[in-house]
Regions:
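Helix-start/capping segments and mature chain N-termini
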Residues: 1-38, 44, 52-222
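Dinucleotide-binding Rossmann-like beta1-alpha1 core, especially the glycine-rich loop
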Residues: 48
Length: 222
């Protein structure tokens, strides 16, 4: 949230709703309304809503108002050197602590984000972001053969690409197969970040980055 403007808020709330479908809709709607009303109209914020299943019904939803961390236009990636530790990779929340640890591990290697690979070395997801790349003018992302969290930002970026006349596809790819490809890390906080370094893999130039960052920013609504 930046000065009261958000991007695809309804999609984020819908994704949260589908992951807690055992809650009454009226209770959930009232909670969402309180979250929106409580979030300030000025400043940069990174609100977080939580569902704690172990608590009594009626006391399971929590709202945390957090200041937004610093945003950057580029980032450095590091491939995780262990098996995917996520237990529920297609639902946002249950694996958050584990993914935060992966990012901290990437930081120790001089990177901003860890990239999770499947058992065969194919790209699955970023620890706290979605990974996409441009190959021969086509915007690509991991396919359904690897588990990845449904990313609202990935969804929006793919829509923007299609609207601009670009082809999109999903595919299986290993990090080294992205040599000389323009590669991005996507998240609701950072938007689109161009990857400048990924261990010893040469990264492609950021030919599409600025135009897509501008288009994504234009989707923000007050």
């Amino acid at each position: 949230v930046s000065d009261g403007s958000t991007r695809a808020l309804s999609r984020h709330l819908k994704r949260f709703s589908t992951s807690v479908d055992n809650l009454e809709s009226d209770y959930l709607l009232e909670f969402f309304e309180n979250v929106i009303a409580t979030t300030p109209d000025t400043g940069d914020w990174f609100p977080r809503i939580e569902f704690r299943e172990q608590l009594p019904i009626g006391e399971q939803l929590f709202f945390r108002l957090r200041h937004a961390p610093v945003r950057t236009q580029t980032c450095i990636l590091w491939s995780l050197d262990e098996l995917d530790p996520r237990q529920n990779p297609t639902v946002k929340g249950p694996d958050l602590s584990a993914c935060q640890k992966l990012r901290r591990k990437a930081n120790l290697h001089g990177a901003d984000e860890a990239v999770i690979l499947d058992g065969d070395g194919f790209i699955a997801d970023g620890a706290l972001s979605a990974i996409v790349w441009w190959r021969d003018g086509v915007l690509c992302a991991p396919d359904e053969s690897t588990p990845w969290l449904p990313s609202i930002t990935r969804e929006l970026v793919f829509e923007l690409a299609s609207q601009a006349g670009h082809d999109t596809r999903t595919e299986r790819a290993k990090p080294e197969e992205l040599a000389n490809c323009e590669t991005w890390s996507l998240s609701s906080l950072q938007g689109i970040r161009g990857v400048t370094s990924w261990q010893n893999i040469p990264m492609g130039k950021h030919k599409m980055l600025n135009s897509f960052r501008k288009r994504l920013m234009m989707l923000s609504e007050g």
